[in-house]
């Protein structure tokens, strides 16, 4: 979908963000692809105070040792990973990138500059998704080591959603 001209791609992290994304998509001109996972995820946004803006990521945790950049249901997994790393003395910055296209280049470049390494996490094929978009951005503007976590390039299987990840 990223290769389609003018396409907006949104992958919300929780119910509050999903509702806001649907409202924003309704107001947009042009095609929008809203990607929702099958699994129930914890709600961590406060609906009363949450502001959704297409193309603007969200920093969820402080940290300069590594940046974990996630989308969709993997945002909550990234938050849990940051807690695990903190217990080991590693301070991870977690970014919620709900809009894969257009990509929030500023927040990603800032994280790359300040952290020096990035892990991307998505419940999507590593080809054509968030990780590839970030690798493309960084290769041109700020070469930074990136490790992509996602579905490898193979045909899908059927089964319980967590087992498939």
What function would you assign to each model-found segment?
Residues 1-27:
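Conserved thiamine diphosphate
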Residues 37-165:
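Thiamine diphosphate
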Residues 24-31, 134-137:
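Glycine- and acidic-residue-enriched helix-capping/beta->alpha junction motif
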Residues 23, 30, 83-87:
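Charged, amphipathic alpha-helical interaction segments
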Residues 34:
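Divalent-metal (often Zn2+) His-rich catalytic cores of metallo-beta-lactamase-fold enzymes
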